[in-house]
C-alpha cells in the first residue's frame, strides 16, 4: 500500500489508525485490514480521531483538563442542583466502597467528573470536559490495575474534598481542590511504567493542490 500511494509505511499505519478510530476500517491480527459495514463515528469521538492521527502527550491532556475541569468545579459550586450534589456524594461513596477493585473505582471516578461538568450549568463546558475526560479514561483503564489501595484511597479523599467544596458553595475552594487533584493525578501517572497516553506523533503529508 505504501508503494502504491507513494508514502512511507509509518504514514500508512497512521492513516489506518485514524480510519480505525473513525470506524471506517477494522484490523484483524494475521488477516489484514477490512472496511467495516457501519457508519463512521467522527462526530462522537473527535478527540480520539485527532489522537490517532497526531497523538497527545500526557502533559497536553492534563493542561486541557485543568483548563476545563478547574473552571467547571468553580461553576458547579455556584450552580449545582440538589440532584447533582447527591450524585457527587454517591460517586464518592462508591469510590470508598471499591478500593479493592480499581476498575469499579474508575467507573465512579468517570461519573464524578462527568457530573462536575454537568453541574457547571454550561453545556459547552460539559461537552468539552466529557470528551477530554472520556478519552483520558479510555487509556486509564489499561493501567488502573497498577493503582494500590493507598493510591485509590488518596484519590477518593481528593474527590471528597472537591465534593465538599461544591456542596458548601465555595467556588474558590472547589477550584483549588480540583486543581490539586489533577496535579497529584498527573504526578502519579508520570511515575507509572506504562503511561496511559502514549501515541507517537506522526506527520501526515498534505498534497499540494497545485501539483
Question: PLM features: what roles do these ranges have?
Answer:
Residues 40, 111-114, 149-157, 196-204:
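Short alpha-helical linear motifs
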Residues 172-211:
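C-terminal effector-binding regulatory domain of bacterial HTH transcription factors
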Residues 165-173:
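Well-ordered alpha/beta subsegment
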Residues 52-59, 73-78, 96-100, 142-150, ...:
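A ubiquitous short alpha-helical element
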Residues 1-68, 74, 195-199, 203-211:
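Short linear motifs at protein or domain termini
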Residues 24, 100, 170-171:
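Residue-level recognition of short, well-ordered coil/turn positions
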Amino acid at each position: 500500500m505504501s508503494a502504491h500511494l507513494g508514502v512511507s509505511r509509518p504514514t500508512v499505519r497512521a492513516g489506518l489508525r485514524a480510519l480505525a478510530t473513525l470506524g471506517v476500517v477494522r484490523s484483524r491480527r494475521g488477516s489484514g485490514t477490512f472496511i467495516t459495514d457501519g457508519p463512521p463515528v467522527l462526530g462522537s469521538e473527535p478527540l480520539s480521531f485527532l489522537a490517532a492521527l497526531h497523538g497527545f502527550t500526557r502533559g497536553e491532556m492534563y493542561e486541557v483538563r485543568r483548563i476545563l475541569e478547574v473552571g467547571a468545579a468553580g461553576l458547579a459550586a455556584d450552580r449545582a442542583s440538589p440532584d447533582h450534589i447527591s450524585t457527587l456524594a454517591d460517586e464518592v461513596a462508591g469510590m470508598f466502597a471499591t478500593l479493592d477493585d480499581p476498575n469499579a473505582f474508575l467507573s465512579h471516578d468517570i461519573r464524578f467528573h462527568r457530573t462536575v461538568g454537568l453541574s457547571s450549568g454550561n453545556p459547552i463546558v460539559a461537552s468539552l470536559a466529557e470528551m477530554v475526560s472520556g478519552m483520558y479514561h479510555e487509556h486509564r483503564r489499561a493501567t488502573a490495575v497498577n493503582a494500590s489501595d493507598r493510591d485509590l484511597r488518596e484519590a477518593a479523599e481528593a474527590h471528597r474534598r472537591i465534593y465538599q467544596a461544591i456542596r458548601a458553595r465555595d467556588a474558590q475552594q472547589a477550584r483549588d481542590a480540583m486543581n490539586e487533584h489533577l496535579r497529584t493525578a498527573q504526578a502519579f501517572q508520570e511515575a507509572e511504567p506504562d503511561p496511559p497516553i502514549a501515541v507517537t506523533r506522526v506527520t501526515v503529508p498534505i498534497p499540494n493542490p497545485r501539483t
